[in-house]
Amino acid sequence: MLTIAKMGAHSVAYYQSTVDENRGPDSYYSEDGKQPASVWLRGEKLSEVSAFLGTDNGAIVSGKTVENWFNKAVAPSGAGLGNAPRKDSVPGFDLTFCAPKSVSLLWGMGADSAVRGIVDEAHQAAVSQALDYLSEHAGYTRKQVKEPAGKRLVVEKLAGISGVKYEHRTSRAGDPHVHSHVLLANKQLCRDGKVRTLDGVSLYHEARAAGMVYQATVREILSQKLGVEFGDVVNGCAEIVGLDDPELIASYSTRAREIDQWQAENGLETRAAYERIAQKITRRTKDTDTPLDELETEWARAEHGAQVREFVAGLEPKNEADARESSEDFLPKPSQILAEVAAERSTFTRADVAEKVAELIRPGAISPEDMTVTVEGLVDAALAAHGTWSVTPEKSRELDSTQREGSQKYTTVEVVDEVERGVDMATARVERGVTAESIQPVEGELSPAQADAMRAVVGSDYLASVVVAPAGAGKTSSLKSAHHAWNMAGKHVIGLAPTGKAADVMVGENVA
């Protein structure tokens, strides 16, 4: 899972507050969050980015260096990165990569075996693959170029993307929680040698696809090296079979329970938008002083601790020679990819296809280090397949440099055919309307325009009728009268809505 949050002026101080800078990169997690930040770099012009910043991929950096880089716009090399961010501006983005809870439990209970190291390896490799993907598809900036007709704002590929990474293995509540805070600097080196801000729109557009690449890589490595099997993928995340019991997962997910409880107590459990508010309100200060061995004892003594420990003890880590051979028979075909994508959305972007491809790749299909390359190839094959149409060909970046990757949308022949069938059905006359004589008046008042509209809808001989009016014009309340008229004529009314919120309004207005 990948979540993205904008950093603020105090973000660096928070991550650095738990770091012990006397520890090297190999002094691993005796207390969570103590490991110093490490540099990460990605991009086609990696050597140029490295030389400009004065640091290398994987280098350990001090808190002062991170502070200067993000909050004072000074690179590790001492090079200026433009004006320092204001207190209310965004110095960077926190890309948080989180392993599935069952994977975190392997790490938490795997101290006495090679399991913990394999989980760490899988997580790090998965983050690396996801950053490779983001570098290719979210590594953009915007700049003005002078042309005969005037200035034009174009979207241009960066030389690379860069930042620092903090490793954490527990949640704020002290549960096993393998995750990395990958801080992406807002100011990046461009191909012309200048420094500009990252295009945040492109970053957010590619977040789900990158998160899927991360999850697919984790599944690939753990299935090959530990022999575990994963259950169904739900929203890009799959739990390990044997550790996927909902009660077990919930028992080691204290933060999730706290958030759910706060939402329920405040009557907000049906509104996903309130989850971020709940996260902030219920947030506690993270305990980084409890030694890891004490936490391990608590995890083992928990209600499901014996079950998890028994599962971990039964794993037999495999070496390179024992790992299963990859098989391309496990890779999804273009027709399957397109069918799965089109089942969820009528039009889609390249990122939508990448998201689905990563979800469909079964463990054992490829070598983990080839995940991003494989996803790219399958996406290209699906978009080039017969029956894939570009809905907005004029927005291709090959034709218009002002467009982002996400500007171009696609669909399939099957979707177009379905739309045409829908139009044919909607415009067909079926003579099933309610006659004017049978329409009974109802209590309450409608404006003349509302009454005329509902009379036309109820008495229509077409399979579909459309009511067009601005927000607040009374469309929903007017439909209450139509609902009553249909019921009086012996017809059963079923209400459908595109979103849960809209459905709630229909129920509240007694329309459905």
Feature annotation, model-predicted:
Residues 267-271, 277-349, 358-512:
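ASCE P-loop NTPase motor cores of helicases and related translocases
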